């Protein structure tokens, strides 16, 4: 019997293992070929998707789960339909702004108006403080530029 077991192991080793087929084969213009293989993570994700996509067969459920199944399906379908149609009706009737957006717009408009009035008042004060005789500019080399006029004899100590 050990010989049979030994022969079975040899047969298992001699049988070619599962050959991996490429997920995609990409042919480039210059003639190169690239084979893309799926990873273990991708294979696990595909298996999970298949298990979640397999829906329950309502005919095999008892009455309680059967009613819950259909109630859930009707509720989710109704909600999705109302959500879709609500968005379409809102666009059709022009209800695309938030409910109280007009109040916010008015508030910001009034704030901007007040700040403009304040800046105008400040600007008018600054204009009044300017030199009344702007046409008479002093040259940079003049001794009196930027100083208080004093008698030259008083400024020089003896």
Swiss-Prot record:
Which InterPro entries does the entry mention?
FAM177
Report the superkingdom from the record.
Answer: Eukaryota
| Residue ranges, annotated region (Disordered) | 36-59
Q: Name one Pfam family in it.
A: FAM177
Biased composition, class Acidic residues, residue ranges: 36-48
Entry similarity comment: Belongs to the FAM177 family.
- By what name is this protein known? Protein FAM177B
Gene name of the encoded protein: FAM177B
């Amino acid at each position: 019997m050990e010989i049979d077991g030994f022969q079975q192991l040899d047969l298992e080793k001699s049988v070619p293992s599962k050959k991996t087929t490429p997920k995609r084969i990409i042919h480039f213009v210059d003639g190169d070929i690239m084979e893309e293989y799926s990873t273990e993570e991708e294979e696990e994700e595909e298996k999970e998707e298949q298990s979640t996509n397999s829906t329950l067969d309502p005919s095999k459920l008892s009455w309680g789960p059967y009613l819950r199944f259909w109630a859930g399906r009707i509720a989710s379908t109704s909600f999705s339909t109302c959500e879709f149609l609500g968005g379409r009706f809102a666009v059709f009737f022009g209800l695309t702004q938030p409910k109280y957006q007009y109040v916010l717009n008015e508030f910001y408009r009034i704030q901007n108006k007040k700040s403009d009035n304040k800046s105008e008042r400040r600007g008018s004060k600054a204009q009044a403080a300017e030199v009344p005789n702007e046409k008479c500019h002093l040259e940079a080399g003049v001794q009196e530029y930027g100083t208080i006029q004093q008698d030259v004899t008083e400024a020089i100590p003896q």
